[in-house]
């Protein structure tokens, strides 16, 4: 009798010591993928790749689109946890408010991966992204290599997104020396909460008024805001005359690069990012520790991280990057252009 009671007690203690969300070695894994806003082409691509990798590994996955709402994203997280998700991958809408998602997951012993946007002041299990400071450096240094003097306008992402601040940091690091030498002047800076085309347009209209149309370059944080900037420039017949950067290698941005109205974009190969995120999610759900490359501070905690390197892309690099990787096919780009534009572009490159 005593032996039986002791055995039961040992078993109970073992159950208590195992985190609630952790699965056995071969147990099925249910991944919850919480996305800020699936209206953006960038997140649509991530979602498809993450789903595909999860299926390859035999994991169940549920994707939730918050549509840019913090409250909805928290509701969706709680629903996924109630439905038995044993690991969450989160693209946070607000880096601070998403801490509530981590707290909810902790209560159920479920690990959380911050995907491409670091959740602030929270003990997330892993942060996986591209080096956002390097993104900003690539954007600004590329424009500065062409427009070595003149007025610069910084068009940033969301003030609630840690990545946006890192991108801004990289931009300013790249521009600092030229600014200190009075070669360039940063005439204004605007933040776009939704990283949207409309916000980019509105902010650029104001910058053009403030500078009386005298801009050398617009360091736009992503391709959506860049699209708005180019639209505002076009209305003043300045598209192609004022340099514009971007990020994400969205198809409309590739079209603008070919047409010469956007100088460059920063390409982030999403396949490796999605693969490593899902692989790490499955490992964490099974109680294992994924391999990492870096450590970052969330403000309150030091977080293990996987940081991949971004790539600057302009007209001369399209074939060797986004096309050769299959991110966009030549046929897809050709269809997005007007008749004859692709042929003219490719013949010019020969």
Predicted regions and their residues:
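A residue-level marker of the well-folded mature domains of exported/periplasmic proteins
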Residues: 23-350
């Amino acid at each position: 009798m005593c032996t039986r009671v002791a055995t039961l007690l040992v078993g109970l203690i073992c159950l208590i010591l195992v985190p609630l969300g952790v699965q056995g070695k071969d147990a099925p894994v249910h991944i919850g993928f919480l996305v800020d806003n699936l209206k953006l082409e960038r997140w649509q691509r991530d979602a498809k790749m993450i789903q595909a990798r999860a299926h390859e590994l035999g994991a169940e996955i549920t994707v939730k689109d918050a549509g840019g709402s913090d409250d909805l994203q928290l509701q969706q997280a709680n629903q996924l946890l109630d439905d038995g998700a044993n690991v969450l991958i989160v693209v946070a809408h607000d880096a601070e408010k998403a801490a509530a998602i981590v707290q909810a997951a902790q209560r159920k012993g479920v690990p959380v991966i911050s995907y491409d946007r670091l959740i602030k002041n929270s003990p997330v299990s892993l942060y996986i992204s591209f080096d956002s400071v390097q993104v900003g450096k690539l954007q600004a240094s590329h424009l500065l290599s062409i427009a070595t003097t003149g007025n610069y306008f910084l068009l940033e992402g969301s003030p609630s997104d840690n990545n946006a601040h890192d991108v801004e940091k990289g931009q300013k690091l790249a521009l600092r020396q030229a600014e200190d030498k009075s070669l360039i002047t940063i005439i204004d800076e605007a933040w776009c909460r939704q990283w949207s085309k409309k916000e980019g347009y509105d902010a650029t209209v104001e910058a053009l008024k403030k500078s009386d149309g005298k801009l050398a370059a617009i360091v736009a944080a992503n391709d959506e805001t860049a699209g708005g900037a180019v639209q505002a420039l076009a209305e003043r017949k300045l598209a192609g005359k004022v340099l514009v950067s971007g990020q994400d290698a969205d198809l409309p941005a590739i079209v603008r690069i070919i047409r010469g109205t956007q100088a460059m974009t920063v390409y982030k190969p999403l396949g490796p990012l999605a693969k490593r995120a899902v692989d790490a999610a499955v490992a964490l759900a099974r109680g294992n520790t994924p391999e990492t490359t870096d450590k970052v501070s969330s403000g309150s905690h030091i977080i293990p991280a996987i940081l991949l390197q971004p790539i600057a892309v302009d007209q001369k690099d399209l074939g060797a990057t986004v096309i050769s990787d299959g991110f966009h096919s030549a046929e897809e780009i050709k269809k997005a252009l007007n008749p004859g534009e692709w042929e003219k572009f490719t013949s010019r490159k020969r």
